[in-house]
Amino acid sequence: MAEDLEIRDSGKIAAAFASASMPLAEPRTAQDFETAAQAVWDSLPEQFRNALGNVMVQVVDFADAETLDALRIYNPYNLLGLYHGAGLPFKSVWDPARLPDRIFLYRIPILSYADLNGERTDRVIRHVLIHEIGHHFGFSDADMELIEASA
């Protein structure tokens, strides 16, 4: 399972943010966050969304303990998103049937990151979502850093 996991580990969230009592950036409710994530998804070019096929986007508060352990991430605030599946370059028509690939957006770490860095939450959601979509298309973290640096 660990070999199928790709991570987005921001590395910028301090351990001090492990307290749930910290102030969070807008949106504050889970429904507001899902609405913002849906708006980001809808803003992506249609051709791009269509190329994703049956990839599911799921919003959860934090990564589960099993995922954090598998990735050796000890502070749950350090994982903003995760692509779970086999990227397109690694799939074959001969593969056995699988569950749909999934992109997880971790709501509370994203809100914390936005607040800590003075960024709009929708911009952080967009960055994380596009980053995880990049993994679906076979890009590594290093590949995406090069793309972002040249943009």
Regions found by a protein language model. Give the residues of each.
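Active-site rim/adjacent substrate-binding subdomains
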Residues: 2-124, 136, 140-145
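N-terminus-biased detector of the onset of the functional/mature region
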Residues: 150-151
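Catalytic glutamate of the conserved HExxH
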Residues: 128, 132-136
